[in-house]
Amino acid sequence: MTYSKISQAAHHLPEQVISNDDLSLILETNDQWISSRTGIKERRISRSENTSDLASRVAEKLLEKANIDATEIDFIIVATITGDSIMPSVAAKVQGTIGATHAFAFDMTAACSGFVFALAMADKLIRSASYQKGLVIGAEVLSKYLDWEDRSTAVLFGDGAGGVLVEACSEQHFMAESLHTDGSRGQNLTSGNNPLRSPFSDSEEASPFIKMDGRAIFDFAIRDVSKSIISLLEESSVTAEEIDYFLLHQANRRILDKMARKIGCPRDKFLENMMTYGNTSAASIPILLSESVEKGLILLDGSQKVLLSGFGGGLTWGSLIVKI
């Protein structure tokens, strides 16, 4: 039987760092207000790199780490809500940039859950025994979709990309999954990004800026996401104590604090980096994973169990338990 495993992780970030103090020069806010409410101290902002540029750099790093040629890649999935264009997809641009001539490529649009959804799909593709190697990347340039006069959103988000190489193997590594969507609550977190109005349409152009009902999203994460994680652990007969690390979407430190208490796990098992990068949507989990590998916390030798969980626009939420 064919299974899949995560064999490499990599990330890439824009060079420009924007601190809370920098934001206080253009917004009515300050470092204490931002950091006490979110845990965020700074974020990366792209000056010229598009989402496909960040994603392509991650793909190149993954190939370098694995010491393989791009022609060995069978598929590329990029999770993003900030594509360079409607078409071609970011994944197609990555495929062309790295020369993965044998790979099919497509984007996954599931906001902050996108990387988890994409990783679950990659597992199924490889388990079909039709494909051997795939790149799964989360990449965002959210700064282009922020109203820089709205402190409720401008202070939260950052740009970046991270990803993994998923390969076929003979032992099960993807142990359990739980994926959800509730479109009836979609208006709690939106970004218009509509094309120009046609001469045959009566609709007005929608604002491209990210809009969020912060309280509704906070409550959703604490209630629905925590419940789904607890259910996943119970259904898979894995205890919270058996999980070495929880890698959750990096939205807000208060969310992680409350979720750790609800799940009944030591807070230090919940890894975080939002203080440095802010909320990078689909990129947050793979960036965190890659950094954790670099720090020696995650070994990529199959000896650890980690729980990955994303949640955000859609509304969407999903979790995976993976031996890594």
Swiss-Prot record:
Pfam families on file: ACP_syn_III (PF08545), ACP_syn_III_C (PF08541)
Region (ACP-binding): 250-254
Listed pathway(s): Lipid metabolism; fatty acid biosynthesis
Enzyme Commission identifier(s): 2.3.1.180
Keywords for this protein: Acyltransferase, Cytoplasm, Fatty acid biosynthesis, Fatty acid metabolism, Lipid biosynthesis, Lipid metabolism, Multifunctional enzyme, Transferase
Active site location: 112, 249, 279
Region of interest called Disordered, as start-end residue ranges on this chain: 181-202
Subcellular location: Cytoplasm
Gene3D superfamilies: 3.40.47.10
Protein family: Belongs to the thiolase-like superfamily. FabH family.
Protein name (record): Beta-ketoacyl-[acyl-carrier-protein] synthase III
Organism: Streptococcus uberis (strain ATCC BAA-854 / 0140J)
Gene for this chain: fabH
